[in-house]
Amino acid sequence: MAKHSSFLFFLCILLSTILSGCAIKKNNHSPTFIVHKSAEQRVAQLAQINQWHLRGKIAFIEQRKDKKSKRESATIAWQINEKNQTQELNLTSYLGINVLNLMSENNQHLIKVQGKEYRGNNLAQLVYSITGLTLPTNALSFWLKGLPYQSTDQVKLSSKTHLPINLTSQFDNNQWQIDYSKYKVFDDIQMATQFTIKKDDLLIKIVIKKWFLTH
């Protein structure tokens, strides 16, 4: 009888230990809650970032006069060093073919397309003359971070998260509308991962898979 009681006692201790271990393991996977910073705090954080790199997808959808839309899609890899005033941008087709390679330093731009090289100091104009694509890179480097490009730009913030949900901006004598959605935390900063950018009959859609931010 004593042996039977000892066995039951040992079994209870063993089960208690296993259950405690499961409870501890479960707690280790408890969800983390995001603390939303004020708009000023987020802008201050972004001001400390002097290098950034993103990877994702981009699509250009243009409504033509014949009412047929023209669509161009590519994967995008873009890195900027604001301190050194350099950047590199690559657009690649879904088949892995490099569509466009851009390298810039001190506002001097080199674009390589299909083995040919093109140079200039007006980047948006240079891209358009080569590819027919409207890519407002100067302003886009601000817009993607949810920052105004011009002092007259208007940023609309979410009342709950204090994050940009809409931005109205002026670039190249045109008004652009930028909408933000699906924020994720990268290097302790909430960054949008989906964008729609509109101007007249042009719609640019961007989905970012990964942000890399460096102080």
PLM segments and residue spans:
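Gly/Pro-enriched, hydrophobic low-complexity segments
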Residues: 146-215
